[in-house]
Amino acid sequence: MTIHWEAFLDTVRERGEYSTPEEAERAARVVLALLGAHLIGQVRADLAARLPEHLALILLNPLQAAAPLSPERFVRATAAWIEGATETTALWDIGAVLSTAADAAGDDLMEQVLLQLPPGYDTLFGHPAVPGRHP
């Protein structure tokens, strides 16, 4: 089921404690563009189908990445793309956006998403891995 634009941004805004909808939208656009570069095939399409159309298009037409970024490098890349951001604020942005995307995706799809990402992304999505299970 697709989440509506306003509901998605309202959740990101609340979780990120942003003062304006524009701040929440900026974070969502950057984080999902970077995430899209790490997902392929049906998993990316399935996640996009659960997002508002504007954000789905960003996920489906991502920034290019030569190789998958570790979670730490993902945070640094996010900070570089958001004007005035630090790694600390970027981590906050990532958590607000990816936890909202994870809620929209549901557990089964999130498991597939995390299988395509380097280890450690589970915490960025707010879904710590179960010990003994990948990722």
How should each PLM-predicted stretch be described?
Residues 57-108:
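Short, solvent-exposed interaction modules
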Residues 1-38, 95, 99:
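The feature marks the first
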Residues 18, 22, 38-42, 84, ...:
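Residues at alpha-helix boundaries and the short loops/turns that link adjacent helices
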Residues 4, 23, 27, 31, ...:
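Residue-level detector of well-ordered alpha-helical segments, enriched
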Residues 37-70, 105-135:
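Extended intrinsically disordered, low-complexity coil regions enriched in Ser, Thr, Gly, Ala
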Residues 17, 29, 87-90, 94-95, ...:
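A domain-level signal for the structural core that forms small-molecule/cofactor-binding pockets
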